Structures are given as structure tokens and as C-alpha cells.
From Swiss-Prot:
Its EC number is 3.1.-.-. It comes from the Bacteria. This is mRNA endoribonuclease LsoA. The gene is lsoA. Pfam families: RnlA-toxin_DBD, RnlA_toxin, RnlA_toxin_N.
């Protein structure tokens, strides 16, 4: 039996709509049925079609849908195969020499809260204590190996899970360790002092006013900004910066209303297009210039964080950005934080 030419392909699903519409498909639609199956439909050469995308293990199989007109299935599937595969770009290979059981528990809790599924895998490596597979509903997949000597190694694509792992590591490593790890991972020679100097130049009014964790998150994005490698999606460059502005919003809120840890940012803001405003229930406490700064920061955070790797049912709901766009986000975050501190005279 001939091998299915459309099985287990390394498909970037974000590219499918553009590829199909540019090749004659009209009335395009995508419908996520569940984590294992997405239906895409439309009209091609006058014939309505529906085909299935089935993600598994980080790859995707294109399949026929029973009961549908499959006259042009091979042509449509070939358009996807020829135009929507990931290129040979930088993979996520991250090793931490010392990673305690508590670190592992905290990482897994953090990833689970972000919607990542973690399952223990068969361990065939005699040097490993445990192996885990981390997955998302859109097919992103990272393998974690915990070695007997106390180190942890991650392997996968530089997508959503990798960005979340980087985000977590920024919270537990110091700046020297973060720089050393990135130098090793990307074979570069970035100096800690260079990052500190750039951070000071980006935040002349706020460097001594913002929380240390915010500075560390911004530093992580400044490090990534200096790394010149090809990636399918440069969201990972600015992910930490968006975490930083999220932290800045919480820092301001803590000064005026001391929010409980159970509250998320959405409880303070409501949409009033084209921006967000403070919910009426909080306007007595949060108003004036503080409210203006908070709403500007939240509107920008919401637009970008929710469009990148924020959890959605399918990968078609996420946005792929290039390096220049990611750098622009980093720079804008720094401007919003520094300008916000100046306006509030913190």
C-alpha cells in the first residue's frame, strides 16, 4: 500500500488560509472540532470541500472527510504541503545544569495553569530519571528529560511551550545565569553588562522605580533581541517583555488597591473600543492619571499578548510575527513603562 504523502507533515497551520486563498479557494473557513481534529472548508474550482487536519506529536496529517466531495482533495492538500511547511529553523534546545524537584514542581504547575498538558513518557535513557512530553491542543510539543545528575533538558520547537519555559526560567535564574545560558544555547557572546547598560538607556526615568522581576523580564527580551537566528515565529523574543508590562500593571494596582492573588487583570478592565477602561466597580479607587496609564498599558498588553501565544482552541487563532515586529513590541513596552512611571511620579 502506498504511503500517504500527507501524513505527519510539519505544517505551520497559520499559513494555510493565505496559501489556499492565493491559489483559488474562496469562502475559506476553519473550525476546531477538538484537540485532535480541525476542519477547513471552502470552495475550489466551483466545488465545496471539507478536509481534516489532525495534529499529533507536533506534526499534522491532512485527511479526507467522509461524506464530503473529495474531487480536489489531492490538489488542495498539495497546496498546503508545498506552501505551509515549517522551514529548517532554530529548534528549542535548553539545558539547566541544576534543577531541583521543587523547581520541576513549580515549572509543571506554571505550565499546567497556562493550559499545557504534561505526561510522563517511557524512559529508555539509562542516564535519565524521568522523561516528560509537554503538548498543546494546537500540536506544539516539547520533550523534557530530567537526568540523574540533576540537570534538565528541553527539546522542541521555538513556539508556545518554549516561550513559557523561557518565561519561567527568567523568574528563577539570576541575570548572570540567564546570559550564560543564552550564550551557550545560541553560541553567542552577550555580556551581562551590555544588557544592563541597554536596560538603563531604555528606562532612564523608571530603572530605580520598577520591581526587580520586571527588570529581569525586560532584560530577557533584550537578550533575545541581540540573537540573530532564523525562527518561524519571533514571538518568543517579546514574550518576556509582555510579561514585564503585565507585571508593571500589577505593580501600579498594588499601590492603589492591593489586588488579591486570585484576581486576574481582566477583572479591572472592560472593553470600550478602541481601548480598555477601568470597570465601573473600581473607578472610585482607580481614576485620574493612574487609570489613564493603566488603561494604556493594559490595552497594549491585551492586543499583543492575546494575539501571540495566549491559549486559544487552535493554532489558527494565534499570530506569527517577524523579528522587526517583535523588536517593536519590546521597544514600545519599555516606552510605556518608562513613560508611565514619569507621569505617575512613582
Amino acid at each position: 500500500m502506498a504511503q500517504n504523502p500527507f501524513k505527519a507533515l510539519n505544517i505551520n497551520i497559520d499559513k494555510i488560509e493565505s496559501a489556499l486563498t492565493q491559489n483559488g479557494v474562496t469562502n475559506y473557513s476553519s473550525n476546531v472540532k477538538n484537540e485532535r481534529e480541525t476542519h477547513i472548508s471552502g470552495t475550489y474550482k466551483g466545488i465545496d470541500f471539507l478536509i481534516k487536519l489532525m495534529p499529533s506529536g507536533g506534526n499534522t496529517t491532512i485527511g479526507r472527510a467522509s461524506g464530503q466531495n473529495n474531487t480536489y482533495f489531492d490538489e488542495i492538500a498539495l497546496i498546503i504541503k508545498e506552501n505551509c511547511l515549517y522551514s529548517d529553523t532554530k529548534n528549542f534546545e535548553y539545558t539547566i545544569p541544576k534543577f531541583s524537584d521543587d523547581d520541576r514542581a513549580n515549572l509543571f504547575e506554571f505550565l499546567s495553569e497556562e493550559g499545557i498538558t504534561i505526561t510522563e513518557d517511557n524512559n529508555n535513557d539509562p542516564n535519565c530519571k524521568h522523561q516528560y512530553i509537554m503538548t498543546t491542543s494546537n500540536g506544539d510539543r516539547v520533550r523534557a528529560k530530567i537526568y540523574k545528575r540533576g540537570s534538565i533538558q528541553f527539546q522542541g520547537k521555538y513556539l508556545q511551550i518554549a516561550s513559557l519555559i523561557n518565561d519561567f526560567m527568567c523568574s528563577i535564574l539570576n541575570m548572570k545565569e540567564i546570559v550564560e545560558q543564552k550564550n551557550k544555547e545560541f553560541n553567542v557572546d552577550i555580556k551581562k553588562e551590555t544588557i544592563e547598560s541597554e536596560l538603563h538607556s531604555k528606562l532612564p526615568k523608571s530603572i530605580d522605580k520598577i520591581h526587580e522581576d520586571i527588570k529581569k523580564q525586560l532584560s530577557c527580551s533584550l537578550i533575545m533581541k541581540k540573537i540573530d537566528v532564523e525562527m518561524e515565529d519571533y514571538s518568543t523574543y517579546c514574550f518576556s517583555a509582555l510579561r514585564a508590562i503585565e507585571g508593571f500593571i500589577y505593580q501600579i494596582l498594588n499601590d492603589v488597591c492591593n489586588p488579591s492573588s486570585s484576581k486576574n487583570l481582566g477583572e479591572y478592565f472592560t472593553e470600550n473600543k478602541p481601548k480598555y477602561i477601568i470597570r465601573e466597580i473600581h473607578q472610585e479607587t482607580i481614576n485620574g492619571e493612574i487609570a489613564e496609564v493603566l488603561c494604556e498599558c493594559y490595552t497594549y498588553w491585551h492586543e499583543n499578548r492575546h494575539g501571540l501565544f495566549h491559549m486559544k482552541p487552535g493554532i489558527a487563532d494565534t499570530k506569527t510575527i517577524n523579528k522587526l515586529e517583535s523588536i517593536a513590541i519590546i521597544d514600545t513596552v519599555c516606552q510605556l513603562i518608562d513613560g508611565g512611571v514619569a507621569r505617575l511620579k512613582l
